[in-house]
Design a protein with these regions (language model features):
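PLP-dependent enzyme catalytic core of the Aspartate aminotransferase-like
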Residues: 253-281
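Active-site C-terminal subdomain of aminotransferase-like
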Residues: 112-198
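Conserved PLP-binding catalytic core of the aspartate aminotransferase-like
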Residues: 206-235
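Active-site phosphate-binding strand-loop segment of PLP-dependent enzymes
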Residues: 37-93
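Conserved PLP cofactor-binding pocket of PLP-dependent enzymes
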Residues: 238-254
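Conserved active-site segment immediately N-terminal to the catalytic lysine
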Residues: 100-112, 122
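Conserved PLP-anchoring active-site segment centered on the Schiff-base-forming lysine
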Residues: 1-13
Length: 281
């Protein structure tokens, strides 16, 4: 079956590599890393290539920090009778990702990121139609249909279960509920993002993604002629560890606004950065 991979960043491009390694037939619809996926372009591609059976995309593309219009894209694909598979690694639990309401067949995410658990444990939320269907996996470990048959009704893993990570996830879910669930976490991450971008703006440092497409998960900033190595060393000495952006054509760096972090932390970060810039180094 032919896949349509819609990409606008490094993680969408990784899907292409995965499709190649799995020997899948695919076609690609690409956008600039600072431009959200255009639902109309997806519709046009589906009209031009009716043999496409499945549409794949990344919801929150952290290469640049933009959020793609998942509901609109999934709705178009579903209306055309396509299967919709989504990478929600950095959006699950912080953005709406309702399978039924959006028309998504399966999404993949992780216990860390917006759930604020530990990494290592990945999971898939999928329709019963897919999970109870015939497996087409070429990997024993990644055969989700087989794993599903073990989990229900007996609750078993096929292999040794990651007990420690599962317990950490359970605690993370308790804290998620205690905080107030999706709306409360969205509000905190948005407040983090606002504190960060406002502080950066005062320093003359701007983000590279247009505001209408910018997520509150991670933001990529244009460094201009600032030395990343020097800035990194100074911030690390002040207790902040950041990492460079994935964009190769610009001098950029990225800062995430998820995790057990609050606006006051970003205010302190911007204060430290201001001191570095004023030092003339």
């Amino acid at each position: 079956e032919k896949l349509l991979i819609v990409e606008n960043g490094a993680y969408g491009k990784r899907m292409i590599k995965q499709a190649e390694m799995a020997g899948k037939k695919y076609t690609v619809l690409s956008f600039d890393m600072c431009t959200a996926i255009d639902p109309k372009a997806v519709q046009k591609k589906l009209d031009e290539e009716p043999d496409i059976k499945t549409v794949m995309l990344v919801h929150s593309e952290t290469t640049s920090g933009l959020i793609n219009p998942l509901k609109e894209i999934a709705g178009i694909a579903k209306a055309a009778g396509k299967t919709v598979l989504v990478d929600t690694m950095s959006s699950f639990a912080a953005y709406e990702t309702d399978l039924k309401a959006f028309g998504i067949d399966a999404l993949a995410s992780s216990a860390n990121k917006c759930l604020e658990g530990l990494p290592v444990l990945a999971f898939v939320v999928a329709t019963k139609k897919l999970l109870e269907g015939e497996s087409c996996s070429k990997s024993l470990c990644l055969d989700l249909c087989d794993q599903y048959r073990y989990l229900y009704p007996d609750g078993k893993f096929r292999f040794t279960s990651p007990t420690t990570v599962l317990l950490a996830l359970r605690r993370a879910l308790d804290l998620y509920k205690l905080e107030g669930g999706l709306e409360a976490r969205k509000a905190r991450y948005q407040a983090n993002h606002d504190a960060l971008t406002e502080g950066m703006r005062r320093l003359g440092i701007t983000s590279i993604v247009p505001e209408k497409w910018q997520s509150y998960i991670i933001t990529t900033f244009d460094l201009g002629d600032i030395s990343f190595a020097d800035m990194y060393a100074r911030l690390k000495a002040d207790g902040f560890v950041i990492y460079p952006g994935k964009l190769t054509d610009k001098n950029t760096f990225r800062i995430g606004t998820i995790g057990d972090i609050y606006p006051k932390d970003y205010e302190r970060l911007c204060k430290c950065l201001e001191e570095y810039l004023n030092s003339g180094k």
